[in-house]
Design a protein with these regions (language model features):
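Short intrinsically disordered terminal tails
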Residues: 1, 101-102
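Glycine-rich, flexible loop motifs
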Residues: 2-79, 88
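Trp- and S/T/G-rich repeat-edge/linker motifs of beta-rich repeat architectures
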Residues: 91-101
Length: 102
């Protein structure tokens, strides 16, 4: 099949890294992640999602190359959005904060 993407479009496509069997506290590399299974083995979740039928989500991570000043935004497949950050590679993440859109 012919490739219908231009070079510019190809460079802007998002690539999602599948995650399972991970602790979100250890994901400090900038990127786009997805946990596509409701029952995936994920720790470090917001309390509202830390049960066996709520672990499907997108995770966007912003950070410097050193892993410091890291921010995580979690978009749950249930329509909930959460945010947390750390200001140092040696510091733990802040508590998850739920973002209310209304």
């Amino acid at each position: 099949m012919e490739n219908l993407f231009t070079t510019k479009e190809e460079k802007t496509k998002l690539s999602l890294t599948q995650i399972d069997n991970v602790n979100l506290n250890n994901i400090t590399r900038a990127g786009f992640y997805v946990s596509s299974g409701w029952g995936n083995n994920i720790s470090g979740l917001p309390q509202e999602l830390d049960n066996n039928d709520s672990r499907a989500f997108y995770l966007v991570v912003f950070s410097l190359e050193s892993g410091s000043y890291c921010q995580q935004i979690l978009y749950s497949f249930k329509g909930l959005i959460f945010y947390r950050a750390t200001s140092s590679s040696n510091s733990p993440f802040d508590q998850w904060r739920k973002i209310n859109l209304i």
